[in-house]
Amino acid sequence: ISTRPSPTTADDVLHDMDGRIAAVIDGGPCQIGLESTVVGIEGEEIVIYRPGGTTKEALSVIAPTTVDSALAKDGAHPKAPGMKYRHYAPSAPLTVYTGEADKVVEEILSFAEKTDKKYGFFVSEETARLLPKGLPLFVWGQREDKESFAHNLFSGLLYFNRHPVDAIIGEGTDTAGLGLAIMNRLTKASGYHIVVEKR
C-alpha cells in the first residue's frame, strides 16, 4: 500500500483497504489533497525535504528557503519519508507531459488516436475538451488552478486503479507555488517518466 497513491476520500480508503478494516469515519475529502510540507533548518536556511501544501514561496517570507537537491534525482536519498523510493504509483504506467502548453496538448492528443494500448488521460479541463468522447478520463481542474490539481491529484491516480487502462497519459504543470509539490508527486508516481515539451 505504501507505494500507491495516497487516499484522500473515505471511498478511496475503503477501496484501498479492501475488507481489511471494519469501517471508516468519513470527514469529507481532504481539503488540500497533498501531505504536509516537511522541512529542516540548515544554517540560516529552511530546506524543503518534501514539498506539500505549504509552498516554498510562503516559507521564503520567514527565511531563505531552498529545496533538497536529492528530490530531483532518481536514485538519490532524500531525507523525508516517502521520497526514497517509487511512491504514489497507480497500477498502470504513467507518463507526464509538461512545458509549453500547445506542445503538451498536441502530444497528449496524439495518444487519443493510438490503438496499440488502452490509454487513460489525466488532464486539465482545457485539454479534456479537445479529446474524443468516451475515452477513460479524469479531469483534475482548470489548467491554472493548482489548488484543484493538488486537491484531485491522488483521487485521479486512484481512479485508474478502479478503471484499469494499459497506460496513463498525464498533463503536468509548472513548479511555481503548489506546482512544486504536484510535480514532485507526479515524478514519483511516474517513476521519473516526465517529458518536458519545448517550442
List each model region and its residues:
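Active-site-adjacent structural elements in enzyme catalytic cores
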Residues: 1-199
